[in-house]
Design a protein with these regions (language model features):
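Linear, non-domain "peripheral" regions
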Residues: 1-168
């Protein structure tokens, strides 16, 4: 009996409209967290610049195997987790843990942007952008946060429309 354990690999997603909608939703989620002023300026600027760069790189390399990119991203995730664990060691209350956790979520989202070749990966990015919006909402102190939520809802509706035009 000769069983093969690997399944068929999904095709890369070529729909640029869907990719732009996902990138917009992610960027809005990142902006919503950055606007709460719990991150360093350097972290905020890097995240806001690197996420769109990541989506462009991912689009251009969507048909490649990207092993080196995946190894680099795994290393980046280890660094982000190590920074989070280092920062969380000095936390004196559960409320004070929100900022380091927000930074960790932010870096996971940014790093993930560099490897989203398939529709399924784009859907994971949308779920992650939902998490970013929730984190921003948990950190928000005023009702003006609703504007971020509204902008994200528009981008999410755009993604739903784009993903419903063609099914896999």
């Amino acid at each position: 009996m000769n069983l093969r354990l690997t399944g068929a690999k999904a095709l890369p997603e070529d729909d640029l409209t869907m990719r732009i909608a996902v990138a917009a939703a992610v960027e809005i989620g990142l902006l919503a967290v950055v606007a709460q002023d719990v991150l360093s300026d350097r972290t905020a600027i890097l995240a806001l610049v690197l996420a769109p760069v990541g989506y462009v790189v991912s689009y251009r390399r969507r048909a490649a195997t990207n092993v080196a990119v995946k190894v680099a991203l795994a290393c980046g995730l280890f660094v982000a987790t190590a920074r989070f664990l280092g920062q969380i060691g000095y936390v004196t209350s559960p409320d004070a843990a929100r900022a380091p956790l927000a930074a960790l979520f932010l870096w996971v989202q940014v790093l993930h942007a560099f490897d989203v070749p398939r529709r399924r990966d784009l859907a994971f990015s949308m779920v992650s952008s939902t998490t970013m919006i929730a984190v921003g909402g948990a950190l928000a102190l005023t009702t003006s946060y609703l504007w971020w939520l509204l902008a994200w809802a528009v981008a999410s509706a755009w993604w739903l429309w784009a993903s419903s035009r063609r099914t896999c």
